[in-house]
């Protein structure tokens, strides 16, 4: 019986399903609404059960209740019953996010007694070794086998639907070679969000990674770092998948050389873009959140607060504490050069640079807490005195011209300000003073290893100590932000909105959600041409015009380290010297780019990847279904095509709009898009069910900006 390609089932597999660890969690969570709108109950996520977090992430459902499953999905219920009878424990329910997709979380401890048997089977089938004490690899093997068990049962019981399994990262990759070896009738897609070797080699910081990709002895490099078995899993997954994809052009280049298979396409990461009805709304949000950051800055720099907040800009870098990979080293060095330039030029501008990277700490410093309390106490006292003065002015004006009052308004300061209030105000003001020679701290927490912390050591090296003469001030906040923070009570998104510029000079960043999030919120950012996001935007926007849209791209691939640092310092200085009006206009342009990052657009790339998988797995059936002639030569190749870039913006750029007959490829680089390369516009009729509108209308967006 032929499987139904149009009404197929989709299972997405990852270790970060309902389990926040890194960026894949954000990808799955933000993509879910679009995927659920497209697939409905035919979409299920599979992953390992994290007992510590699942109860707050998942609404459990009674999977034994037949009403939970539509009739055509009863094979899934029967498979779960069979696995439960054989001792496999799991949680079935709805993920508590927008779209509420169905999830199956397998308890790996319930199958751990199979570990040695499955390891032996993995060696005999695929030849992949697995050391005994690598717990992460052990869990990857358990997850791979239990997923293959599940998919194998479902494919046997359900002969009517085509089944697609989409696997993210090597931790979910064990299942791919097993599906191939065990001949399970499932279309497989593997997406690598970062290669193992790439992350290890770049973290070392002593190699020109991207310009030497073709020269690495991958087996030797993996062996030297003790990850050869993990590398084997990753490489086997890439080679046995029907469709192999990465998240960016730069990662595709990396995967081609390190994993020895050229990716079939690119699946860029998107975001759920919330559009405002009017431009001024997000500008007002910026002003509100900036005021909260101002409150923190007043407290942190009390006693040395000699700069004008209206003439101050806020820069920040945020992410995992990967000192070199995330470009923290380059950021600090560029800040030191910027500080020198501003001092030499006599600039009145001040830069406050935040580093938001979690490190091991004991607690907030007493000084950080005390500083905020001192300023808050002054603010409360001033508010109380102000209220009293207002009341006295009101009483005075009410009594005039009676009681011998000669003026409509009080003219005697003593009449307005009582002596007790003067004393209280003086005490509060004197409390602001710091001991002689004491400077505002550069870190807000007590570090567990202050002496060996790379960020603090570099700050000491470049002598950015928050001296009064410094035009660049530095604050290292070694903890992710949240609204319950006692010194900087903002969630991360609120903090980003309040800042002026995000700086992310990463050296190894397969995609880069942080600059993408900045773009969606209308905050200009600095990225690099070796980050996925930077390469993506560089491909869409004319290189010399990207900064007009608030996207500054530093060259870390073809310039020397010193030249890259100088370029970053140039970009930051250029931004500092902008007027307030110029910054507002730039934020408007930046926010308009957000449509290019919406999952409603990016989700199409996933549709195309599934299409290519179905074409390869069922070529003749697919040809009959869509009624087209596809040559064998075009079946497994992705053609290039003419690409257009966004031109220089006008002072008030128009809204993005799709042009008819456009051949713009949303996937950057040489690989092209899966859909365009296979002339597969018909697939929208087969798969999206109207969830993703592909019509040309005023609400659609593309790589074009038209003047309205």
From Swiss-Prot:
Modified residues (Phosphoserine): 159, 363, 560, 651, 655, 660, 662
Pfam families xref list: Glycogen_syn
Region: Disordered, residue numbers: 687-708
Residues reported in the UniProt entry to bind UDP: 20, 320, 514
Entry's Gene Ontology BP terms: glycogen biosynthetic process
Positions of alpha-D-glucose 6-phosphate binding: 280-281, 283, 286, 290, 500, 583, 587
Positions annotated to bind UDP-alpha-D-glucose: 193, 199, 320, 509, 511-512
Pathway: Glycan biosynthesis; glycogen biosynthesis
Record's keyword terms, sorted: Allosteric enzyme, Glycogen biosynthesis, Glycosyltransferase, Phosphoprotein, Transferase
GO cellular component, one term: cytoplasm
GO MF annotation, one: alpha-1,4-glucan glucosyltransferase (UDP-glucose donor) activity
Top-level class of the enzyme under EC nomenclature: transferase
EC number of the protein: 2.4.1.11
Catalytic activity reported: [(1->4)-alpha-D-glucosyl](n) + UDP-alpha-D-glucose = [(1->4)-alpha-D-glucosyl](n+1) + UDP + H(+)
Biased composition (Acidic residues): 693-708
Activity regulation field: Allosteric activation by glucose-6-phosphate, and phosphorylation by a cAMP-dependent kinase.
Domain of life where this protein originates: Eukaryota
Induction: Synthesized in response to growth limitation.
Leftover remarks: Present with 6300 molecules/cell in log phase SD medium.
Function: Glycogen synthase participates in the glycogen biosynthetic process along with glycogenin and glycogen branching enzyme. Extends the primer composed of a few glucose units formed by glycogenin by adding new glucose units to it. In this context, glycogen synthase transfers the glycosyl residue from UDP-Glc to the non-reducing end of alpha-1,4-glucan.
Family as reported in the entry's similarity comment: Belongs to the glycosyltransferase 3 family.
The protein's name in its UniProt record: Glycogen [starch] synthase isoform 1
Gene label: GSY1
């Amino acid at each position: 019986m032929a499987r139904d390609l149009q009404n197929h089932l989709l299972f997405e597999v990852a270790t970060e399903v309902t389990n926040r660890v890194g960026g894949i969690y954000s990808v799955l969570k933000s993509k879910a609404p679009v995927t659920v709108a497209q697939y409905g109950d035919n979409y299920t996520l599979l992953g390992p059960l994290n007992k510590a977090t699942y109860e707050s992430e998942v609404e459990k459902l009674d999977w034994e209740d037949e009403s939970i499953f539509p009739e055509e999905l009863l094979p899934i219920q029967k498979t779960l019953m069979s696995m439960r009878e054989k001792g496999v424990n799991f949680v079935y329910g709805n993920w508590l996010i927008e779209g509420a997709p169905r999830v199956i979380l397998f308890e790996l401890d319930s199958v751990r007694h199979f570990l040695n048997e499955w390891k032996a089977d993995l060696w005999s089938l695929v030849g992949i070794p697995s050391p005994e004490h690598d717990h992460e690899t052990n869990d990857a093997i358990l997850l791979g086998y239990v997923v293959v068990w599940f998919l194998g049962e479902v494919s046997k019981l359900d002969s009517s639907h085509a089944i697609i399994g989409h696997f993210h990262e090597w931790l979910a990759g064990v299942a791919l070679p097993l599906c191939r070896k065990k001949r399970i009738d499932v279309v497989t897609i593997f997406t690598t969000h970062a290669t193992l070797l790439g992350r290890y080699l770049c973290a070392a910081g002593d190699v020109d990674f991207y310009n030497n990709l073709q020269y690495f002895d991958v087996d030797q490099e993996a062996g030297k770092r003790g990850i050869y078995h993990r590398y084997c899993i990753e490489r086997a997954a890439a080679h046995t998948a029907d469709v192999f994809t990465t998240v960016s052009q730069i990662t595709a280049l990396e995967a081609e050389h390190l994993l020895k298979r050229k990716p079939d396409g690119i699946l860029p990461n998107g975001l759920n873009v919330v559009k405002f009805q009017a431009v001024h709304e997000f500008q007002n949000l910026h002003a509100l959140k900036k005021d909260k950051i101002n409150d923190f800055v007043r407290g942190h720099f009390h006693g040395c607060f000699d700069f004008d907040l209206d003439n101050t800009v806020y820069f920040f870098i945020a992410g995992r504490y990967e000192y070199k990979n995330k470009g923290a080293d380059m950021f600090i060095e560029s800040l030191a050069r910027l500080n020198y330039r501003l001092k030499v030029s006599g600039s009145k501008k001040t830069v406050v640079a935040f580093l938001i990277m979690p490190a091991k700490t004991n607690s907030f410093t007493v000084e950080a807490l005390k500083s905020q309390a001192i300023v808050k106490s002054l603010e409360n006292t001033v508010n109380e005195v102000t209220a009293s003065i207002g009341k006295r002015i009101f009483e005075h004006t009410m009594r005039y011209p009676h009681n011998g009052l000669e003026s409509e308004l009080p003219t005697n300061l003593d009449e307005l300000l009582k002596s007790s209030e003067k004393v209280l105000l003086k005490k509060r003001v004197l409390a602001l003073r710091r001991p002689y020679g004491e400077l505002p701290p550069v870190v807000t927490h007590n570090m567990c290893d202050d002496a060996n912390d790379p960020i603090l050591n570099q700050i000491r090296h470049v002598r950015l100590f928050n001296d009064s003469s410094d035009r660049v001030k530095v604050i290292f906040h070694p903890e992710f932000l949240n609204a319950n923070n006692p010194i900087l009570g903002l969630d991360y998104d609120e903090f980003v909105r309040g800042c002026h510029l995000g700086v992310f000079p990463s050296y190894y960043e397969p995609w880069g959600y942080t600059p993408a999030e900045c773009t969606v919120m209308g905050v200009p950012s600095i990225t690099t041409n070796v980050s996925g996001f930077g390469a993506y935007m560089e491909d869409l926007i004319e290189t010399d015009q990207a900064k007009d849209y608030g996207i500054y791209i530093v060259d870390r691939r073809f310039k020397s380290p010193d030249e890259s640092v100088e370029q970053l310092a140039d970009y930051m200085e250029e931004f500092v010297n902008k007027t307030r009006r110029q910054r507002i206009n730039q934020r408007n342009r930046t926010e308009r780019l957000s449509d290019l990052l919406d999952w409603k657009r990016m989700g199409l790339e996933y549709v195309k990847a599934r299409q290519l998988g179905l074409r390869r797995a069922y070529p003749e059936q697919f040809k009959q279904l869509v009624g087209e002639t596809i040559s064998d030569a075009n079946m497994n190749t992705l053609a290039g095509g003419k690409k257009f870039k966004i031109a220089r913006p006008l002072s008030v750029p128009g809204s993005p709009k799709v042009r008819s007959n456009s051949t713009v490829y949303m996937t950057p680089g040489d690989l092209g898009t899966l859909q365009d390369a296979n002339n597969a516009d018909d697939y929208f009729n087969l798969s999206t069910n109207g969830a993703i509108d592909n019509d040309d209308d005023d609400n659609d967006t593309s790589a074009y900006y038209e003047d309205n």
